[in-house]
Swiss-Prot record:
This is Outer mitochondrial transmembrane helix translocase. InterPro entries: AAA+_ATPase (IPR003593), AAA_lid_3 (IPR041569), ATPase_AAA_core (IPR003959), ATPase_AAA_CS (IPR003960), Mito_OM_Translocase_MSP1 (IPR051701), P-loop_NTPase (IPR027417). It holds the Pfam family AAA. It catalyses: [protein]-with a C-terminal TM segment(out) + ATP + H2O = [protein]-with a C-terminal TM segment(in) + ADP + phosphate + H(+). The lineage of its organism: Eukaryota, Fungi, Dikarya, Ascomycota, Saccharomycotina.
Length: 362
């Protein structure tokens, strides 16, 4: 009888101790999360990356050494790209020369020469710029090139970096984004697929989303009119953007599908470092007959054409290796051939002598 009692007591004690330990770790985890708020879960690696990015910014602008950042502003550092880190220029974007000229006047000059735009209210820089048009036409590349050419820091907004599980913290992160942009000016705040973030408001919106949009508009209106901080949005669904936000994007540029001349320029840029067959390559033929292709489509077409030549090289080299003609490490006996028109027309399922637009693609 006493033996049974002892076993029961031991079992109860074991369960009690196990429960106590579990509760201890659970409460400790919850307390740490509450204390950390939106910064919870930030690893040492993330914090080290933030510190490294800040050092780059200070090295580029020594005056920032006197600037202090709060915890929320530091979380935005990982989203910042300096002009030195951007490898895209207007020379890398083909077929958009008239648009680039307009963007110089609307974006680059206000960022580089704010004194010109502060002399008169009529010359104030636009509060925002919207790039809209079909996908794959270079809107994001244009935004990066604008930051590169103007020497502005580039903050790319991602919803994952704004939204937080703690109530009210998302608003603080948005506030930190604007305050950090003011400290790092000249600065471009870029919102890709802006329609997904600033879409038309309705009574069915969640409270958190509604307050976040209201906070964003308030901070947007609070930007100084010296043009040193500018918001650029990109979308292929302009009709989904709320009218209140469209009003704050007075400069709107359509980035449409390229015409024949534009496609020629885009292809020239894409193939400038690629060997082309002098006798069997007709760039104008390809440009004239790729109607409806976006810049992204043309890039993929060029990639597929180059891949065909690479596959031929691999096949020939394997045959020579198998026959014992060359060694596997031999790189001088065989070269990748230049690209030909047929490499492109093959991908469009056409005969090289036919016009591409007159034939079915299936």
């Amino acid at each position: 009888m006493s033996r049974k009692f002892d076993l029961k007591t031991i079992t109860d004690l074991s369960v009690l101790v196990g429960t106590g330990i579990s509760l201890y770790y659970l409460v400790s985890r919850l307390l740490n999360d509450v204390e950390s708020g939106p910064l919870s879960g930030k690893s040492r690696e993330s914090k080290a990356k933030q510190s490294l990015q800040w050092e780059k910014l200070v090295k580029r602008s020594p005056a920032l050494a006197e600037v202090t950042l709060d915890a929320y502003e530091r979380t935005i550092l990982s989203s910042i790209v300096t002009p030195d880190e951007i490898n895209i220029t207007f020379q890398d974007i083909g077929g958009l020369d008239p648009l680039i000229s307009d963007l110089h006047e609307s974006v680059i000059y206000p960022l580089m020469m704010p004194e010109v735009y502060s002399n008169s209210p009529l010359l104030q820089a636009p509060s925002g710029v919207l790039l809209y048009g079909p996908p794959g036409c270079g809107k994001t590349m244009l935004a990066k090139a604008l930051a590169k050419e103007s020497g502005a820091n580039f903050i790319s907004i991602r919803m994952s970096s704004i939204m937080d599980k703690w109530y009210g913290e998302s608003n603080k992160i948005v506030d930190a984004m604007f305050s950090l942009a003011n400290k790092l000016q000249p600065c471009i705040i870029f919102i890709d697929e802006i329609d997904s973030f600033l879409r038309e408001r309705s009574s069915t919106d969640h409270e958190v989303t509604a307050t976040l949009k209201a906070e964003f508009m308030t901070l947007w209106d609070g930007l100084l009119n010296n043009g040193r901080v500018m918001i650029i949005g990109a979308t292929n669904r302009i009709n989904d953007i709320d009218d209140a936000f469209l009003r704050r994007l007075p400069k709107r540029f359509l980035v449409s599908l390229p015409g024949s001349d534009q496609r020629y320029k885009i292809l020239s840029v894409l193939l400038k470092d690629t060997k082309l067959d002098e006798d069997e390559f007709d760039l104008q033929l390809i440009a004239d007959n790729t109607k409806g292709f976006s810049g992204s489509d043309l890039k993929e077409l060029c990639r597929e054409a180059a891949l065909d030549a690479a596959k031929e090289y691999i096949k020939q080299k394997r045959q020579l290796i198998d026959s014992g003609t060359i060694d596997v490490n031999d790189t001088s006996s065989l070269k990748i051939r230049p690209l030909k028109t047929k490499d492109f027309t093959k991908k469009l399922r056409m005969d090289a002598t036919s016009t591409l637009s007159s034939q079915p693609l299936d």
